[in-house]
């Protein structure tokens, strides 16, 4: 049974402005595994990746009904599988979590659905 759905839309240039003012922003949003991948990318790809993870984690927190605050960005990890599909690999949710991240123009959108296994 679906127990939560959250979406988030993020302007990539807004994330880039924050990152350019303070590169430690990436450390706040990304887990160690996500950060290791991030460091391998070109600047443009870093910004789309960071914005996508931000949107994905915001969408997850909305699906949980808490928003970021009761959860932290470090509580949630999103890693791409071998086909390039984003997968939530770490979270406080005990059921199944599904995520989709899409980039278009200067924006990134993420949607998360939470399914209870009981």
UniProtKB/Swiss-Prot annotation:
Transfers the 4'-phosphopantetheine moiety from coenzyme A to a Ser of acyl-carrier-protein. NCBIfam families: acpS, pantethn_trn. GO terms for molecular function: holo-[acyl-carrier-protein] synthase activity; magnesium ion binding. It is an enzyme of class 2 (transferase). SUPFAM superfamilies: 4'-phosphopantetheinyl transferase (SSF56214). This is Holo-[acyl-carrier-protein] synthase. Keywords: Cytoplasm, Fatty acid biosynthesis, Fatty acid metabolism, Lipid biosynthesis, Lipid metabolism, Magnesium, Metal-binding, Transferase.
